Amino acid sequence: MGAPVGRREFLAGVGGLGAGLGLGALSHWFPLPPSDVKPAWSPGREKLVTSSCLLCPSHCGIRGRLVDGKLVRIQGNPLHPVNRGGLCPKGVAGIQLLYHPGRLTGPVERTGPPGTSRFRRVSWGDALDRITRALAELRSRGDARSAVWLAGETSGIMGEILRRFSGAYGTPHLLLEDYADGSAEVLKLCQGIHAPPAFDFSDSDMVLSFGAALSEAWWCLPQAARAREGQSDRRPRWVQIDVRHSRTAARADEWVPVRPGTYGAVALGIAYVLLREGLYDHERIGERVLGIEDWEDATGQVVPGLRRLVLRYGRTEDVSARAGVSAETLVRVAKTFGRASRPVAVWDQSVSWRSGGLADALAIHALNILVGAVDRAGGVLVQPPVPVPRLDGPADGAPAGGAVPSWI
């Protein structure tokens, strides 16, 4: 039987094992082209390039530091109005996207069966010729509707060009994945505007967060972090409604734990208190909002309004039992939210991306509508559309496949 192992020997052995594993990992070949090594140090030619980060809809301003024409660092742009010099870890790591060995720098053609990673590079001329021939063949057969266009970042005029092209070609299958978290769909259904919301934390006096990772993976971490700075009487009060004690919940002024999948129910319960106690913006609701009260459709059928639905399904006792939050806490948070001067309710993709999440996000945004936080300082803002020039219609009239409206 071996000698007994004490605490000191055990820790030393574990440390040696970790060092060995780390050195072993370094021995593996990493497919990155090595940088040119100079025989002697020299300062190099430095250049700063101003741009925007496109890794999330915030589009923070960035500065890239180039040395001898090679990007070596990405930093926030202190002159940009959105992030004011701050930058989240994802934005800083954008340099890894540039140098990643799997990054596509041109068109490729699949050489293996679907699901494999076997591709070969083709020239731009060859790729454009193939696409043109395939589109022309579909259109000549009257089968233009079978074409599908998938696109990612389409800010500015690019999205309008794709919409006009798909409509002129004759396919309704245009999918623009600009805001795949569903936030733009929430604003489209509530306000008729297909755009992501912008939450004005700096001018708000209460932020009611439904699972939003404001200190971890928010769209614009610098803006959220900046709003948290300063003395408690000069920054908004943060209430985090969350299923776990996340980093954001730990830094909030109050954490309200709830059961998973009940964000929408909690929002409904808060709306119940706002309507019952009259803690909503009567003036804005009366002037700018439709559907709060019952209304009649074109056939004369009475459609229940938001007030009737909330008072029927958002009773405090029912929401308390379902979400696992006490009725006293629910009422207190709702009254604090309704009595604030510039409150705002927020959510993120952890809410809207899951199954049934769109309904939850709609319920949360309904709180902003009730307290008049839409299109107001300290509330929910929407970036106005880019004033791009109006494009002319198709030169050859209606396509063979039949022009149909594009959808997003």
Stretches with model-predicted labels:
Residues S246-R251, L309-R315, R339-W347:
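Short acidic (Asp/Glu) and glycine-rich catalytic loops that position anionic groups and cofactors
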Residues G286-I292, V333-F337, V382-P385:
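Short linear loop/turn motifs
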Residues G142-S146, Y280-G286, V344, D375-V382:
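Flexible, glycine/charged-enriched surface loops at secondary-structure junctions
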Residues E328, F337-I408:
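A glycine-rich, hydrophobic/aromatic-adjacent loop/helix-cap motif
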Residues M1-L279, S326:
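N-terminal export/assembly segments and adjacent metallocofactor-ligating motifs
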Residues R237-S246, V333-P343:
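Active-site-adjacent bridging/hinge elements
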Residues P114-R120, L279-V325:
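N-terminal leader/propeptide and maturation segments of large enzyme subunits in energy/redox metabolism
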Residues G159, R163, G264-L268, P304, ...:
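Non-catalytic, well-ordered alpha-helical scaffold segments
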